[in-house]
A protein has these predicted regions:
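Conserved core of the sugar-phosphate nucleotidyltransferase
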Residues: 1-59, 67, 74, 90-111
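A short, ordered amphipathic alpha-helix with a cationic face
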Residues: 4, 62-63, 80-81
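Residues that recognize and position ribonucleotide moieties
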Residues: 9, 62, 84
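Cytochrome P450 catalytic domain signature, combining two hallmark sequence patches
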Residues: 26, 80-86
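A hydrophobic, small-residue-rich beta->alpha segment in the mid-to-C-terminal subdomain
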Residues: 72, 77-82
């Protein structure tokens, strides 16, 4: 759906507390959403699909790797006159017209 890094996950405090009590796994406690997502029968989810103009699930816009930083820096340089206030649609359009930029972080493994 949305590019990786442009999506959100929202949980109630009660859900987080319940998940915490149910698991002893250090990994689940560090990455609190893992336990919740592994148990959809206990924690049902509502998934919102990105509109067609923003749909690009394989695009990585997270900052997990030096290559991610390089790509994000280029995006911010492009939009610097907008004072860091530019919509995702503009980023997507920019990347679609500058496909060479997509090669910067296309091999980064996502979690």
């Amino acid at each position: 759906s949305y590019p990786d890094g442009m999506d959100v996950q929202v949980y109630s405090l009660n859900t987080l507390k319940k998940s915490y009590k149910m698991t002893k796994s250090l990994l689940d406690r560090e990455h609190v959403t893992l336990h919740i997502r592994k148990n959809p029968n206990i924690f049902p989810a509502l998934h919102l699909i990105a509109p067609r103009s923003l749909f690009w699930p394989n695009l990585g816009l997270t900052l997990d790797d030096k290559l991610d930083f390089i790509l994000i820096k280029k995006i911010f340089e492009k939009f610097k006159n907008k004072k860091n206030n530019f919509p995702l649609k503009e980023i997507i359009d920019y990347l679609k017209h500058n496909k060479k930029l997509l090669k910067i972080n296309h091999n980064v493994k996502r979690k």
